[in-house]
Amino acid sequence: MKKLIALVAVVAMFAAFSISTVGKKLPSVGYVLVGPKNDGGWSMRHYQGFKSLEKHGYKVSGVEMVPEAESSKIFRKLARKHDIVFATSFGYMDGMVK
C-alpha cells in the first residue's frame, strides 16, 4: 500500500507540475534508485512511476543500484543534465546536499 501511495504521489505531483508548463518546455527528470529497477519492491515502483512520465513528454533518465555513501557524484552528474533530480532513499540526503 505504501508503494502505491508513493507512486500516486509522484504521478500527481508531475501532473500538477505539467499543468503549469502548458506551452512551455517540460522539465527533464533524473532519479537515483537504491536497488535494481526490477527488484519487485521500492526501486521497481519508483522506476515504473518515472517511466510513466515519458508518455507525457518528459525526458527521464536515472541510475540504479547507487550506494548511498557514493551518491553525491551521481547527483552532481544528473543535476548537470536535468532540471529536477529525485532521490528515492532517505539515505541519499547527505549526497544530495553536497
Segment roles from a protein language model:
Residues 1-27:
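Short, low-complexity disordered leader/linker segments with a strong preference
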Residues 93-98:
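Extracytoplasmic ligand/sensor domains, especially the bilobed periplasmic-binding protein
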Residues 6-16, 69-71, 79, 87:
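A sequence-composition feature that detects small, non-aromatic residues
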Residues 26-28, 56-59, 81-85:
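Loop/turn elements at helix/coil->beta-strand transitions in domains of secreted/extracellular proteins
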